[in-house]
Amino acid sequence: MDTLFTEFENAERSKVAPLAVRMRPRTLDELVGQTEAVGEGSWLRTAIEQDRLSSVILFGPAGTGKTSLAHVIAESTKATFVEVSAIGGTVSDLRREIDAAEKRLTMSGLRTILFVDEIHRFNRSQQDSLLHAVENRLVVLVGATTENPFFEVNSALISRSRVVELHSLSDGDVTDLVKRALEDERGLGGR
């Protein structure tokens, strides 16, 4: 639970955060350049807005907004959002999070969205450890990868998820982001 002190600490911390962190999109409307994936009428946008997201693998080059989209999902959902990095995560970490998710679901009916950044870096056994939880909807998996998931992610996970491809930003998109960073109070406009 946030208190007056944690709000103050968060405000102070955000003052020294890197520009990219301060400018990270907070809503789907702030996410730039991915209208095909999250534009008006897309299934993903509808699922996020209705808080009815099912497992999804976000696939695209670095810098396309995969992690930002996951953070927008975190802000938009009533579910508990848990983030795991495939670089340092272990099978025991995953099992602990899945056990906690199952308890939350059983005790309070609260769903868990498990965000696995760089899911392609998990080995086969680590990916297999997610299968039961995804299959039984103990967690809603949101995986992010720069690699083609059809080659790098367990086919059983792929078959239980939707794959959404994010595309590189256009020059116009990058220009819009730079202007926003210069003018927005969270960016350089607030300095």
For the regions a protein language model found, what residue spans apply to each?
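Conserved beta-strand position immediately N-terminal to the Walker
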Residues: 29, 56, 164
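Short glycine-rich substrate-engagement loop in P-loop NTPases that contacts/grips substrate
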Residues: 37-42, 79-113, 124
